[in-house]
C-alpha cells in the first residue's frame, strides 16, 4: 500500500514514536496526509516513489495484489483525494505489473471516489464492518461487477459483525 488517508495526521521522517500499549493503531499515520494539499511539488516525488517500488517488484511472485491506496477520502478529505487516486492508478498502469491492481471501496457515500476505484480495480476489494445482513447486501451489489472480490477489512464487535 502506497497511500493512506486514515488515522493520525502528524508525521515526520525518521524514527517514529513507540507504540502505545492498548491503543489500536497508535502509530499509524496518514500518507501523504495534509502535505498533499499544502505542497505544490509533491506529485513528482510520489510518482517516482510508486514507480520505483512497482518496477522493482512487478514480476515478484510473492506479491499477489497491489492495494494502492487505503481508504481514499477518509479523515474528511472526501473528493480532495481524487487527484492522487487517479494518479496512482495511472502510474501503476504505466509500469504494468504482472499482479492485479486494486483500491478497496469502504464508504458507499463517496460515490466519485468509488467510481474511480471500481472502474480501475482488477480485483474488487472492499472494507465492511457491518452485520451479516448488510455485509451480504454489499457483496450482492459488488458481485454485479463480475470480477474477483476480496474483503480486506472486516469485523467490529460493536457492529455485530462476528
Q: What are the functions of these language-model segments?
A:
Residues 1-123, 127-134, 144-145, 158-161:
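Active-site mouth of glycoside hydrolases
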Residues 149-156:
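Short acidic/histidine-rich active-site segments
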Amino acid at each position: 500500500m502506497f497511500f493512506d488517508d486514515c488515522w493520525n495526521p502528524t508525521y515526520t521522517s525518521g524514527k517514529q514514536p513507540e507504540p502505545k500499549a492498548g491503543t489500536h493503531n497508535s502509530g499509524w499515520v496518514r500518507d501523504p496526509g495534509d502535505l498533499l494539499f499544502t505542497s505544490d511539488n509533491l506529485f513528482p516525488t510520489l510518482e517516482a516513489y510508486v514507480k520505483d517500488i512497482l518496477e522493482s517488484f512487478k514480476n515478484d511472485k510473492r506479491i499477489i495484489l497491489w492495494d494502492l491506496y487505503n481508504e481514499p477520502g477518509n479523515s474528511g478529505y472526501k473528493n480532495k483525494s481524487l487527484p492522487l487516486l487517479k494518479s496512482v492508478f495511472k502510474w501503476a498502469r504505466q509500469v504494468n505489473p504482472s499482479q492485479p491492481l486494486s483500491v478497496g471501496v469502504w464508504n458507499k457515500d463517496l460515490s466519485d471516489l468509488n467510481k474511480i476505484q471500481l472502474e480501475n480495480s482488477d480485483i474488487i476489494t472492499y472494507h465492511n464492518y457491518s452485520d451479516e445482513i448488510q455485509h451480504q447486501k454489499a457483496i450482492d451489489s459488488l458481485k454485479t461487477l463480475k470480477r474477483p472480490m476480496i474483503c480486506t477489512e472486516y469485523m467490529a464487535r460493536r457492529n455485530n459483525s462476528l
